[in-house]
């Protein structure tokens, strides 16, 4: 009998062998010959997905779980390149940026301050509109997941350790804020995973709610935190027993598949029971820490029809659940449970929780599509009052409690929304805050939607109620300065940019560019919504082509991922965050390409730095940034048709002076080392508008990089 060669085996047999190989062995095997290096083997999705999730504890993403190339690239770069960015309202230091000097926002939580008169203040930044890296992350190791709570940002490391910044409950008086990542603690006797591995405390999956965090450990324990400074409580139930994972399969009754911390409830998907809901538990602040390490939850409610398991024969599921199907994913909203099943259907159930009743109503199917359409749902995501439903053809539906779920249970449900920018654009996940939300797309970029309360920066698009935000498509309204995106932004979305150089570029151009007087009339036209929408779209195309503009043909890394590649996005309340892979080598090259070559200066004088230094000393010691932003304030007033402020003061820079903004002391034209940016001679764009109107000016018309979009009939309100 002849020996069987490895390559003689059917590919299905090879797939059964792969899970027993570590990554080094798998790569070595698939590199031995051409036959094994074929994409369907070398980039086998189940292998790389499992490797990434088991090694780094990265949460599964159902929409791309079969994308082997993505999982392979993620595995390679997670080792060295993951960064945590946050933005939005920094109440209780929930962004993790610490205390530093910054230019204050013209809008405070209480109303409008003097436009543009932003003085440097040393305190925690109240509003952050541009993504900024969290501080103190490097010492934690590899970050696998991050989630925002109502007043916190929480991180999971590849070792299974949880850390948080801010406070769990911003309405409680006894919770001091944590400005830097602090470990979430366990009862006495259990180590934090940063100390040593212990299955009972190493976290496999976690969820951040409004004011509490739920986590599922490797051993199958459910842990609940309601205070940054106090140990967790283990959750146990009176009505059923949970299974410790050791020596038990995932089909064993009592096995916990997932936990979700909702707006005001906790929930878990448990084999044999279904989706179980309970009131979040809290540790008594006055009780000694050593007295209590677990809580027996007396009152629970089970979502009907959610106990069916295709691979389980050890118990008899309820008859209704067989038709509903096996739960694939679920979310816990303010008043509802929403879940999708393996049959491609989505169901909702109302949570009834009062003194008379603790129950979850019978489920109702959420209709997808229109008459004649058949949609197969693959995932549900959401929080608080908003949700999204994904289908296998790339359709993404969005909805909320008031407009949709209330109608489903009371009268007639209005059709779910389909935002144009989310359809067939490879959306992986959607993260919802109170009034804003973000979409993560498979190519690694994030788009923003909704409203930015009090110009808090939650959309991550830049600006604080000023032209920098307006040029990204934000219209500021009311006394509090709420920012709402123009309708045009729903066609392709507005991307979040991580490069600081783009912020400099935006600041320079929105201040009039090289000749503010020449651009004055064009800038004033932005008060009209359609003009603002078109100009913001032009800037969107230019900013999205940043690597093409400044990186040549070598801006993609060897695995074709972008310089900034977002792995996940999260949002809650008025703030947001993202876990991003950053290729520092590529980022530095692009950063350098944004700068002009140093200019040879006359003898005894460096080209621009010495001149700037002399002018600083003569300007009443006001400081570089103060004078730059005073000038920006004059631009804002001028843009709005208001009188200039402090026209006699030493810091006043006349916008009519075309040379004012190429001076290195003014923001956006020159880098800290004195070198000018390549856009320091650019003008504010001049466009031919969709209605046939030509923007006034003396400069050449600006060309559309990707062509002017057709908004008519595709975007509501245009």
Protein language model features and the residues they cover:
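Conserved blade-ending motifs and adjacent loop-strand segments that build the rim/top face
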Residues: 371-373, 410-431, 460-567
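Consensus positions within tandem repeat domains that build extended binding/scaffold surfaces
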Residues: 91-92, 150-152, 167-170, 210-212, ...
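Conserved core positions of repeat-based scaffolds
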Residues: 86, 152-155, 164, 212-215, ...
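Blade-level signature of beta-propeller repeat domains, shared across WD40, Kelch, NHL, RCC1
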Residues: 443, 453, 557-619, 629, ...
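F-box-proximal linker/hinge
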Residues: 50-91, 97, 112-122, 132, ...
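Skp1-binding F-box subdomain of Cullin-RING ligase substrate receptors
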Residues: 2-88
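Solenoidal tandem-repeat scaffolds enriched in leucines and small polar residues
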Residues: 201, 206-353
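Beta-propeller domains
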Residues: 85-134, 158-182
């Amino acid at each position: 009998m002849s020996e069987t060669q490895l390559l003689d085996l059917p590919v299905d047999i090879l797939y059964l062998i792969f899970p027993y190989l570590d990554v080094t062995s798998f790569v070595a095997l698939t590199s031995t010959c051409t036959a094994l290096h074929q994409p369907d083997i070398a980039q086998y999705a189940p292998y790389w997905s499992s490797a990434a999730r088991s090694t780094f504890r990265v949460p599964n993403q159902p929409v791309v779980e079969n994308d082997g190339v993505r999982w392979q690239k993620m595995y390679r770069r997670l080792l060295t390149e993951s960064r945590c960015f946050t933005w939005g309202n920094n109440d209780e230091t929930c962004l993790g940026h610490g205390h530093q000097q910054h230019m204050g926002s013209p809008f405070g939580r209480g109303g409008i301050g003097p436009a543009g008169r932003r003085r440097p203040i040393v305190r925690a930044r109240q509003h952050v509109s541009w993504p900024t890296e969290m501080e103190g992350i490097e010492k934690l190791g590899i970050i696998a997941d991050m989630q925002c709570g109502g007043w916190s940002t929480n991180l999971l490391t590849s070792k299974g350790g949880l850390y948080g910044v801010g406070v769990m409950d911003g309405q409680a008086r006894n919770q001091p804020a944590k400005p830097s990542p602090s470990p979430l603690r366990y009862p006495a006797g259990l180590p934090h995973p940063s100390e040593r591995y212990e299955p009972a405390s190493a976290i496999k999956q976690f969820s951040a709610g409004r004011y509490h965090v739920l986590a599922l450990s490797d051993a199958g324990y459910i842990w609940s935190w309601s205070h940054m400074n106090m140990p967790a409580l283990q959750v146990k139930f009176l009505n059923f027993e949970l299974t410790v994972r050791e020596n038990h399969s995932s089909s064993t009754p009592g096995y916990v598949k997932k936990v979700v911390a909702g707006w005001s409830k906790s929930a878990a998907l448990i084999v044999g029971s279904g989706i179980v809901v309970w009131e979040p538990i809290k540790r008594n602040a006055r009780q000694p820490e050593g007295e209590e390490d677990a809580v027996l939850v007396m009152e629970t409610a089970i979502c009907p029809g959610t106990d069916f398991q295709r691979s389980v024969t050890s118990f008899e599921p309820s008859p209704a659940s067989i038709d509903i199907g096996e739960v694939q994913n679920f979310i816990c909203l303010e008043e509802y449970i929403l879940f999708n099943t393996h049959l491609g259907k989505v169901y909702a159930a109302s949570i009834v929780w009062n003194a008379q009743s603790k129950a979850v109503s019978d489920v109702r199917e959420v209709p997808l599509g229109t008459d004649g359409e058949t949609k197969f749902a693959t995932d549900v995501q959401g929080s608080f009052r908003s949700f999204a439903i994904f289908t296998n053809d790339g359709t993404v539906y969005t909805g909320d409690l008031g407009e949709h779920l209330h109608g489903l249970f009371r009268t007639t449900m209005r059709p779910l929304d389909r935002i144009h920018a989310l359809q067939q654009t490879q959306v992986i996940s959607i993260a919802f805050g109170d009034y804003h939300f973000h979409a993560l797309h498979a190519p690694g970029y994030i788009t923003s939607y909704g409203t930015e309360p009090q110009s808090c920066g939650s959309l991550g698009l830049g600006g604080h109620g000023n032209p920098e935000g307006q040029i990204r498509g934000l219209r500021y309204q009311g006394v509090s300065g709420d920012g709402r995106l123009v309708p045009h932004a729903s066609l392709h979305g507005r991307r979040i940019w991580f490069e600081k150089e783009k912020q400099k570029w935006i600041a320079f151009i929105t201040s009039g560019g090289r000749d503010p007087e020449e651009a004055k009339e064009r800038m004033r036209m932005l008060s009209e919504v359609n003009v603002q929408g078109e100009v913001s779209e032009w800037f969107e195309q230019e900013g999205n082509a940043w690597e093409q503009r400044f990186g040549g043909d070598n801006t993609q890394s060897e695995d074709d991922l972008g310089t900034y590649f977002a792995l996940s996005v999260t949002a809650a309340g008025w703030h947001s965050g993202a876990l991003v892979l950053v290729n520092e080598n590529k980022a530095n090259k692009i950063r350098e390409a944004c700068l002009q070559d140093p200019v040879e200066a006359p003898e005894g004088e460096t080209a621009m730095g010495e001149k700037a230094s002399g002018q600083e000393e003569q300007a009443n010691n006001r400081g570089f940034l103060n004078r730059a932003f005073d000038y920006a304030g004059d631009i804002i007033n001028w843009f709005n048709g208001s009188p200039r402020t402090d026209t006699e003061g030493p810091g006043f820079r006349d916008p009519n002076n075309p040379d004012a903004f190429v001076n290195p002391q003014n923001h956006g034209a020159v880098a800290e080392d004195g070198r000018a940016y390549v856009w320091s001679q650019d003008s504010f764009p001049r466009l031919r508008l969709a209605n046939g109107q030509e923007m006034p000016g003396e400069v050449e018309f600006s060309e559309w990089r990707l062509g002017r979009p057709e908004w008519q009939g595709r975007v509501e309100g245009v």
